[in-house]
Structure formats: C-alpha cells, structure tokens
Amino acid sequence: MNEIAKETNENATQATTGNKLIHEVGEEAKNGNEQMHNMIEAMNDINTSSHNISKVIKVIDDIAFQTNILALNATVEAARAGAHGKGFAVVAEEVKNLAEKSAAAANETAEMIQSSIDKVEEGVKIADETAASLTKIVESLENVVEIISSIA
C-alpha cells in the first residue's frame, strides 16, 4: 500500500511539474507568435514605404523625360538659329545628357526598389505562414495544458 501511495505521489509531482513546464512553453509560444505578428506589421510598413518611394522615382523619371524633350526642342531651335545658336546648342546638349543620366539613375533605383518590394512581399508571405504555424502550436499547447491540468 505504501508503494502505491509513493507511486501516486511521484506521479502527482511529475504531473504538477509537467503542468508548470507546459504553461511556460505555452507562454513562450504566445510570445513568439506576438513577435511574429509585430514583424509582419513592420514588414508591411516597409513594403508601403517602398511603394511610396517608387512613386517619387516615377516622378523623377517623368521629369527627366520632359527635360530630355525640352533639350531636344532647344537643339532644334539652336539649329534654326544657325551660327547664333551654337552656344545654346551646347547648353541644350548638356541638359539632354543630364536628363538621360537622371532617367538612367531613376530606372536603376526603381529596379532596386522593386527588388526590395518583391523580397519584402516574399518575407511577409513566409512570416504569415510561420505565424499561422505558431498559432496552431499555441492552440495545441493550450489543449495540452487543459489535459495536463485536469490530470494534475
């Protein structure tokens, strides 16, 4: 009889210890899940910011395009002016070169930003999947906690 009582006490002690540990694991899983959701929110903010920067780059590209057209028009007018328009033609050519450099830089920047946007979107997708898995783990742990609590 003493042996049965001893075994029962040991089982109760182990169940209590298991209950305590499973509660701790559950809290850590909830904490991890919350941190995952915070990360997803931050990544969404980065994504929004990248889209806004893309809009600014588009405006810069449009300005470069318009400047290039103005430079071409100025070159035509300089040619019409003949010898008197040579100095103006040089300035128009420099403006054209500057517009082309601006357009190239805007395009390169837009490509880099789009690459970042794509990577952030992929990261958000992975983080969402991870968060869903963590949520399932938390739910499963809560079920285990209930079972162990009823035993302890």
Language-model regions, residue ranges each:
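Parallel, heptad-repeat alpha-helical coiled-coil signal-transduction segments
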Residues: 1-13, 27-34, 41-69, 75-150
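Membrane-proximal coiled-coil signaling linkers
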Residues: 15-25
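Generic hydrophobic, aliphatic-rich segments that mediate packing or membrane embedding
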Residues: 21, 39-42
